Every structure is written in structure tokens, then in C-alpha cells.
Amino acid sequence: MRRLLIIGNWKLNGNKNTITNLIITLVNTFYNISKCNVAIAPPVMYLDITKRYLLNSRIQLCAQNVDIHLSGSFTGDISAEMLQDLNVRYALIGHSERRIHHKENDAYIAKKFFILKKVGLIPILCVGENKREYDSGYTQSVCINQINTIITLLGIEAFKNSVIAYEPIWAIGSGASASPENAQLVHKSIRDYIASYDTSIADKITIQYGGSVTPENVTKFFDQKDIDGVLVGAASLNANSFSMIVQTAENHKKSYPA
């Protein structure tokens, strides 16, 4: 069985005081969570302080980005080994905001995937289509092409102990999510494509949904067979909203003890 995975992506939000208060609240709220996995991705400046508060908690640490190099003259970047030193478990790569604002392409993202696997961190590969691609019916082919770049470079084995997050670009931050039924179709197409290479990997890989996830709509996403959790943006910055999402996952029929 696949455990539901809930990740809060805080993006470029918060300051020392607000983030500290949010972390303390979440740690105290999630002390008895045992049937789903939870992680938070604070801004890089606050990874260390977050790590300290997460010690002995039920919450794991996720990075929002990683460089393709382990060391060298790369001003402003952070390596996978540096993240490892901070007890980071997951790292987001391929997020649409990185693709759009930093011009990261599939080949560059595949290098990030490689370096994370080399160090032993779990990559969360974000895939998804823009509004034009969605309207043209290219959703599934766009996602498959983004995944196929990883397979071409690293082989299907790279997806062992990895995560894929389907995030329709047009839904992120818009307040309009994909319908759970349509999201399920995309998730199934991704799992089926991976199964065409290796059914065991396909059965075990976690595929999250992201894009305007809220406490009000999250249950219907969890109800879908191939949706194994959610990548939460704005709602994860509100302790009550994020707690409701995590508690819904904890109580869902898909969840089970470690």
C-alpha cells in the first residue's frame, strides 16, 4: 500500500517570527499523526530553524530547490549535500514557478533529479500543463514527456523511492483546481506509463496532486485510486487549514500505520 503524503510548500513567504509560530503550532498539532506522511518546505533561509523544531516530531523537512552541483563557484546555490546536513528528506524539482521564472527545462530538471538520487534524498518531480496545453487536450502527453526525460537520462529505476506531483499550472494559486475525476485520469496515465517499464515501481510510486488544494476539496482527491497525497501551497501557510488537510489524510481509508 502507498501511504498518503502531504507536503506544505511555503514558497517565498513568512519571516522568522511567523514561520516559528507556524512550525510550533504544527508540531504540537501533529504529535499523534501516524497513518500518513507529512513534510513542510520552508524558504531556504529557514531550513535550519525548521529542522531544530522538527526534531522528534512527526513532520519531515522538504527543500524547495537544489542545485545540480555538489560544490564549486555557483553563487547563491545550495547543494544536495548541504540539504542532507540539515536533515532534509525531500526536495521539490520541476515546479512550474521554477520552470517559468528561472527558465528551467526538462533536461536541467533531470540533472537535479540525478544529484538528489546520488546523495540519497527523495526527489519530488513536479509535472503539469499550462492553460493552452490543457485546452488543447495535451495534458497527459505533456506530463509523460516531462517524466520521460528522467527515464531517458537515468532509467526507470530512478523512480524507485521517488515522488511525482501532478500540478496543472493553470490551477496553481488560482483558486480553481482540476476536478478530482480529471486529476485521477492524469494520475492513472502517469502510473500506466511507468508500469509499461516496470509494474513494481508503478505500484509503489507516490503520485501527489497539487493546485488550489483546500480542506474543502481534499477528501475527493484522496478518494481517487491513483492520487496518493497532495502538495499544498497557500493553505499550508494557515495552521488551521493545513491541519484539517493532514487530519483528513490521517483519517482516510487509504491511510495505515507505519
From Swiss-Prot:
Gene3D superfamilies: Aldolase class I (3.20.20.70). This is Triosephosphate isomerase. It holds the Pfam family TIM. GO terms for molecular function: triose-phosphate isomerase activity. It comes from Blochmanniella pennsylvanica (strain BPEN). Pathway: Carbohydrate biosynthesis; gluconeogenesis; Carbohydrate degradation; glycolysis; D-glyceraldehyde 3-phosphate from glycerone phosphate: step 1/1. NCBIfam families: tim. GO terms for biological process: gluconeogenesis; glyceraldehyde-3-phosphate biosynthetic process; glycerol catabolic process; glycolytic process. Its EC number is 5.3.1.1. Its main location: cytoplasm.
